[in-house]
Amino acid sequence: MNERVLLITGAGRGMGTDIAKAALAAGYKVVATGRNVEKVRDAIGNSDDLFVVKLDVTKPSDAEAAVDAAIERFGRIDVLVNNAGNFYAGFFEEISADNFRAQIETNFFGPVSVTRAVLPQMRKQRSGLVVTISSTGGIVGQAFVSAYSASKFAVEGWMESLAPEVEPFGIRTMLVEPGFFRTELLTKESTNYPEPLIDDYAEKTKQTFTAWKGMSGQQGGDPAKLAKAFVELISRDDPPFRWAAGADAVATFERKATELLAQANAYRSVSSSLSYDG
């Protein structure tokens, strides 16, 4: 029996619910958190190995309280899954400064706060795995996702830098970059769409809204399969540092790697000529 303890944020819907259920099925003790504890309980169901705690990731005090409660209940935390997030869509000029900051607050500073609360316990244990759900939007940017991609690019840089800092204490890190899965990401529950304000963007905004609404619920990725594979990977002695989840995510990685190499080669002679002479 697996007696490891997993704490996950944003467990009340979508991928968070699926991961929590898969972890329970694999024998984990699960601390499932969310802003609405009743919604989390209803989504996951009953289990003696489930402990539901209130946690708004934008409130560091909530993170500290949730971690304390988890340790009091189970005595340890072996896996942290930073999953909670949202999506402020729109062209950069039409996303308000407040909404842009709110996007970064939830998707970047949220995981930072929860991880900051968990790491002292993991250092004490001299073991642990910190997982943050990123996105292919953290690998490549595109139109209409500037705020979201900014938050995910920040996550990527932070997690890459965190890895060597905590490795001496037996703590591993893992980034997950899902492609398009049939979750609630494009629904009104998860996505905030701006009011069209600038005529130059109006037609493209309308086209994007229409395309995304048609895509919602039709994505090819099965979140239940993702959750099962995810739990299998985190249960390994050597979980991957970065996991491209989905065939489309793998294609995104390959395209980005090709583009970076091409850019490096295109200006190699100029870039290599910038050292002091002599």
Question: Which residue stretches match the model-derived regions?
Answer:
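The beta1-alpha1 cofactor-binding region of Rossmann-like NAD(H)/NADP(H)-dependent oxidoreductases
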Residues: L55-A65, A97
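A glycine-rich helix->loop->beta "capping" turn
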Residues: A69-N82, Y88
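Residue(s) in the substrate-gating loop at a strand-loop-helix junction
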Residues: S135
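C-terminal beta-strand-loop-alpha-helix "lid" module of Rossmann-like NAD(P)-dependent dehydrogenases
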Residues: E167-S216
